């Protein structure tokens, strides 16, 4: 605590999550200073200095029972959270306090949640591929080690299930440390995730930070920074960390909720005018340096399935790979419902992924694109009016579409079939056989919900 620790102020106004506090004029708190309500653990974070000793703050917790005249103390420092190994295997809230009833977190090191992004000369771009074991992702939008990935999708198309499968496949194979930030999502999912990690014996390598749907906007606004601070510490120690955020949209939404109360004019669609800056501050910190790497996977909710909405649109520019989940594909019963024509990755370059992988990816996309163009003709005139080449393209495209589906480990309860991890070599071999016409004699249903191409051949024998 600094010398300003003893400075006291009084609450002069409460509007929802935004609280105004008056301090002596000569000792106004700095922006982002943490203030503590006298006699309780409630923390306020300074957002604006209104002048005349009055500061406007966001309440990080429920503001029930607050009234004018209550005493508030200035800690003189920004919010600091415990970092390092003692956080592993623990569930914490936005202030780094344990919420898993497993005793205090014995961490000697604390770090402010507001840090500067690494300088440009410290950054370390990576082209090494990170195998996920999910066919559609490894083929169409491969991830880079130390890269940033976004899972975009509307309500109920499978963002969280996809993220859980990625955590299952990468975190277990990866063997390093992971940080999971639950930002404004369902408490049930947080609970499921905790037990999933516990059952698979990787809980002692994961730090969990939650600020869920039922919490005030201040918590949801800052919880992503809390998780990121913990991940940054591991990175600066020279480790390779995985950082999962579910859901980045709720971070934006929490900012929108408090923006109007802070007296800012809303911008497009009612979002805060500082949307790009807030997103930039967060995203620029999620990066790999010469010391260590942060590989991040972020779920991004797409309001009303509109990818041009300011929130997802702002997120797009920061990512290395975008996995777009489509309602049309989900409605066909193809899961993961990844849109192979909309999803992209900066790694799709023959110099990075190799000539074979690159050409197979492009051939698969061309076949699917041709099928998309022919769909209207098929709907009106039927398949008989197509040329033999087009008929072949359609047949192969439908097989590719089904082969892009895959049973997940985390969805075994729903599908009843065991999950499959498909190595990248097998994925490339399978799709090469389909586009080369080596599977033209097989029925398309043989490709649905299988792992490798060999399983499709086995399934075809049973069908025939």
Swiss-Prot record:
UniProt-annotated location(s): Cell inner membrane
Binding positions for ATP per the UniProt entry: 153-160
GO cellular component: plasma membrane; proton-transporting ATP synthase complex
Pfam family, one: ATP-synt_ab_N
Membrane topology recorded in Swiss-Prot or TrEMBL: Peripheral membrane protein
UniProt cross-references to InterPro entries, sorted A to Z: ATP-synt_VA_C, ATP_synth_F1_bsu, ATPase_a/bsu_AS, ATPase_alpha/beta_chains, ATPase_F1/V1/A1_a/bsu_N, ATPase_F1/V1/A1_a/bsu_N_sf, ATPase_F1/V1/A1_a/bsu_nucl-bd, ATPase_F1/V1_b/a_C
UniProt keyword annotations, A-Z: ATP synthesis, ATP-binding, Cell inner membrane, Cell membrane, CF(1), Hydrogen ion transport, Ion transport, Membrane, Nucleotide-binding, Translocase, Transport
Complex and partners: F-type ATPases have 2 components, CF(1) - the catalytic core - and CF(0) - the membrane proton channel. CF(1) has five subunits: alpha(3), beta(3), gamma(1), delta(1), epsilon(1). CF(0) has three main subunits: a(1), b(2) and c(9-12). The alpha and beta chains form an alternating ring which encloses part of the gamma chain. CF(1) is attached to CF(0) by a central stalk formed by the gamma and epsilon chains, while a peripheral stalk is formed by the delta and b chains.
Function: Produces ATP from ADP in the presence of a proton gradient across the membrane. The catalytic sites are hosted primarily by the beta subunits.
Name of the molecule in the record: ATP synthase subunit beta
Gene (UniProt): atpD
